[in-house]
UniProtKB/Swiss-Prot annotation:
General function of this protein: Binds 16S rRNA, required for the assembly of 30S particles and may also be responsible for determining the conformation of the 16S rRNA at the A site.
NCBIfam families named in the record: PRK08881.1 (NF006477)
Record-given protein name: Small ribosomal subunit protein uS14A
Stored Gene3D superfamilies: 1.10.287.1480
Biological processes, Gene Ontology terms: translation
GO cellular component: small ribosomal subunit
InterPro entries: Ribosomal_uS14, Ribosomal_uS14_bac/plastid
Gene from which this protein is expressed: rpsN
Subunit comment: Part of the 30S ribosomal subunit. Contacts proteins S3 and S10.
Source organism (scientific name): Salinispora tropica (strain ATCC BAA-916 / DSM 44818 / JCM 13857 / NBRC 105044 / CNB-440)
Amino acid sequence: MARRSLSNRQARREELVARHADRRAELKRLIAHPDTDPDVRADAVRQLARLPRDSSPVRLRNRDVIDGRPRGVLTRFGLSRVRFREMALRGELPGIRKASW
């Protein structure tokens, strides 16, 4: 089980990413476009650098939705490998069966 502070930090980062996503995308588009004036590009780089560090999606971590475990998360299910196995063996995941051949 992840510490509550880590889950709260992740939630705060998700909120910041969502809040600044449009502005960040617009600035990155300006920076990447080949026809952008160099002065405008430099200003866009400065504005991008002024955005909060935690508003970058790179700083998000995939976590288990139940207990917050940060590693071994199966993206398709949002569960860690440990939790996935437990729930699958108990029959709590529809359509998931243990392989047998």
